[in-house]
From Swiss-Prot:
An essential GTPase that binds both GDP and GTP, with rapid nucleotide exchange. Plays a role in 16S rRNA processing and 30S ribosomal subunit biogenesis and possibly also in cell cycle regulation and energy metabolism. GO terms for cellular component: cytosol; plasma membrane. It is a peripheral membrane protein. It is found in: Cytoplasm; Cell inner membrane. Residues 159-161 are annotated as: G5. GTP binds at residues 21-28, 68-72, 130-133. It comes from Bradyrhizobium sp. (strain ORS 278). Monomer. Gene3D superfamilies: 3.30.300.20, P-loop containing nucleotide triphosphate hydrolases. Pfam families: KH_2, MMR_HSR1. The gene is era. Residues 68-71 are annotated as: G3. Residues 211-288 form the KH type-2 domain. Residues 21-28 are annotated as: G1. This is GTPase Era.
C-alpha cells in the first residue's frame, strides 16, 4: 500500500512488537499463528531461535511487525550470551513488548527474573499467558494476578498459540496499540527474512527433530547458493557446520540415512513455502570452534560478544 493509498483509506498504524520470554514458552509458535504462515522455526528443544526473526501481520488498517526473540536464560557460552543480548535489544527497540509466560510453569525463577528486567523497558508491556489449555482456570487467574502484582501490564491475554485460542483477540489488540504511521513493508510480505535464510532455518529445524542431546546446539546451517532454474524449480546448496568429526558422522548417519531424511523433510517444506519444486543438496563440514567465529555470528544475525 502506497502512502497515497493509505491516506485515502484513513489513518494507518504500524509498529514493532517484541515477544520475550523463557526458552520454549511458545514465542515462535505464536508468531507463526499471528502471521498465519510459517516464518520462524519451532522445536520442543529450548533455544531454537537464535536471532531476531520478524513476522509481518496486517490487521485492518494496522501493520504489526512481530519480533521473535531468542529465549532468555542464564547464558554460559559465547553464543548463549549473544542470543540473550539480542533478545533484550529487541525488547528495548520495539514499540510494544509482549511478555510470554508458560501457564504450566507459572512464575518460576526464570519467569520472575524476566519480568523484573522487563520493568526497565520503557514501552508498554502486555502479559501473554500461553498454553492455557493445560492448566485449570483457577490457577490461571492466580498466575495472572501474581504477574500483574510484580509489573503493571497494560493488557493481559490468556491464549493457546498451538490451538489458536485467544490469538485473534491478541492480534486485534496489538493492531489498536501500535502507533499511528505508514506501513514499513508491502502488504503481501510476511517476513523480512530472505528466503535463503528461512530455508537454512528449516533445515536446522529438521536437525533438531532428528538429533538429540547437545548436537543440535553445536551445529549451524548456511545456504551457500540459491539458483532459480529455467524450468521454474530452485536449486539450493546448504552446509551444515559441526565442531568435530564424530558429530559429522552422527549427522550423516549409517549409510547417509540421517542426512537423507533431514534433506527430504527440509526439501518438502521449502517447496511448500516457495510453491515450486526444490532440489536441495546438503553438505556436512567440520569447523572447529565455529561458536567463536565472528563470521558465523554475522551469518546468524547476531552481534559477536568480545568477552
Amino acid at each position: 500500500m502506497t502512502a497515497e493509498q493509505q491516506a485515502g483509506q484513513g489513518a494507518t498504524r504500524c509498529g514493532f512488537v517484541a515477544l520475550i520470554g523463557a526458552p520454549n514458552v511458545g514465542k515462535s509458535t505464536l508468531v507463526n499463528a499471528l502471521v498465519g504462515s510459517k516464518v520462524t522455526i519451532v522445536s520442543r528443544k529450548v533455544q531454537t531461535t537464535r536471532a531476531l526473526i520478524r513476522g509481518i501481520v496486517i490487521e485492518g488498517q494496522s501493520q504489526i511487525i512481530l519480533v521473535d526473540t531468542p529465549g532468555i536464560f542464564s547464558p554460559k557460552r559465547r553464543l548463549d550470551r549473544a542470543m540473550v543480548t539480542t533478545a533484550w535489544s529487541g525488547a528495548h527497540d520495539a514499540d510494544l513488548v509482549c511478555v510470554l509466560l508458560d501457564a504450566k510453569k507459572g512464575l518460576d525463577d526464570e519467569a520472575q527474573a524476566i519480568i523484573d528486567k522487563a520493568a526497565s523497558v520503557a514501552h508498554e508491556k502486555i502479559l501473554v499467558v500461553n498454553k492455557v489449555d493445560l492448566v485449570p482456570r483457577e490457577k490461571l487467574l492466580a498466575l495472572v494476578a501474581a504477574a500483574n502484582e510484580k509489573l503493571a501490564f497494560a493488557r493481559t491475554f490468556m491464549i493457546s498459540a498451538l490451538s489458536g485460542d485467544g490469538v485473534d483477540d491478541l492480534r486485534r489488540a496489538l493492531a489498536e496499540m501500535v502507533p499511528p504511521g505508514p506501513f514499513h513493508y508491502p502488504e503481501d510480505q510476511m517476513s523480512d527474512a530472505p528466503m535463503r535464510h528461512l530455508a537454512a532455518e528449516i533445515t536446522r529445524e529438521k536437525i533438531y527433530s532428528h538429533l538429540h542431546q547437545e548436537l543440535p546446539y553445536q551445529s549451524t546451517v548456511e545456504t551457500d547458493s540459491w539458483t532459480e532454474r529455467n524450468d521454474g524449480s530452485i536449486r539450493i546448496e546448504q552446509t551444515i557446520f559441526v565442531e568435530r568429526d564424530s558429530q559429522r558422522k552422527i549427522v550423516l548417519g549409517k549409510g547417509g540415512a540421517t542426512i537423507k531424511s533431514i534433506g527430504a523433510q527440509s526439501r518438502k517444506e521449502i517447496a511448500e513455502i516457495t510453491g515450486v519444486p526444490v532440489h536441495l543438496f546438503l553438505f556436512v563440514k567440520v569447523r572447529e570452534n565455529w561458536g567463536d567465529d565472528p563470521d558465523r555470528y554475522r551469518e546468524m544475525g547476531l552481534e559477536f560478544p568480545r568477552e
